[in-house]
């Protein structure tokens, strides 16, 4: 009987330890809108592709490491290329973000987005989100099926950024190719280069290294 009690006690302690570890991680919610990061092409070497084809659940399966950083959940808002972004989607995003933050159990939000209108979406949300919690936009210059897809690392870095306490009070930011850029100064400067987002008139917040 004593042996059974010890086993039960050990099991209970293990469960409590596991629950405590989970509770310590921030809760990050991803709102997916499509874009190149969710795009697919005919082969790994083809440059033509269709944006917004891959669901957020599939994108997250490709980056299991994010679960070591945060409790990550996701939902699909739309599946579009960002050239088709419009004010209706902007208003939907702003409303949903404010709803999520008002609940109190969401610590940060990541938005997967195409790069063509990412800076406009970031600027709009920077004006309409009523919280100092992190909102991070992320995308890719190469589709998910490309041999050298940049989406997985960008998504990982976006979750790292949204989960960081230091990101609070910084407004909406863009996390692309290791850079974190404020919504007020970020702009797309190249149609093919992965280092396309820059802040020529302001300083980027930081440069994320691969191991962070």
Stretches found by the model and what they are:
Residues 1-9:
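Bacterial N-terminal signal peptides that target proteins for export
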Residues 13-21:
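Hydrophobic h-region of N-terminal signal peptides that target proteins for export
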Residues 24-99:
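ATP/NTP phosphate-donor binding region
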Residues 31-33, 111-113, 136-139, 173-177:
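Short beta-strand segments
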Residues 112-132:
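Short Gly/Thr/Asp-enriched flexible loops that form oxyanion-binding sites at enzyme active sites
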Residues 138-204:
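Internal gly/pro-rich beta-alpha loop/helix module
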Residues 206-212:
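Conserved small/polar residues in nucleotide/adenosyl-binding loops
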């Amino acid at each position: 009987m004593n042996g059974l009690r010890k086993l039960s006690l050990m099991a209970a302690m293990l469960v409590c330890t596991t629950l405590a570890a989970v509770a310590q991680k921030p809760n990050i919610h991803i709102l997916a809108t499509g874009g190149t990061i969710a795009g697919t092409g005919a082969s790994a070497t083809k440059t033509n592709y269709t944006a917004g084809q891959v669901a957020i659940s599939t994108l997250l399966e490709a980056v299991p490491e994010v679960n070591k950083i945060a409790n990550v959940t996701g939902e699909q808002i739309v599946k579009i290329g960002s050239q088709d972004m419009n004010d209706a989607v902007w208003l939907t995003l702003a409303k949903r973000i404010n709803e999520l933050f008002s609940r109190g159990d969401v610590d940060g939000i990541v938005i997967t987005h195409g790069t063509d209108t990412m800076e406009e979406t970031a600027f709009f949300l920077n004006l309409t989100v009523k919280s100092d919690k992190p909102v991070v936009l992320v995308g890719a210059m190469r589709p998910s099926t490309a041999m050298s897809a940049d989406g997985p690392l960008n998504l990982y870095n976006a979750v790292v950024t949204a989960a960081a306490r230091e990101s609070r009070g910084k407004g909406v930011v863009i996390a692309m190719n290791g850079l974190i850029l404020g919504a007020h100064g970020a702009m797309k400067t190249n149609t093919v280069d992965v280092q396309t987002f820059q802040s020529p008139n302001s300083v980027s917040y930081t440069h994320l290294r691969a191991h962070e």
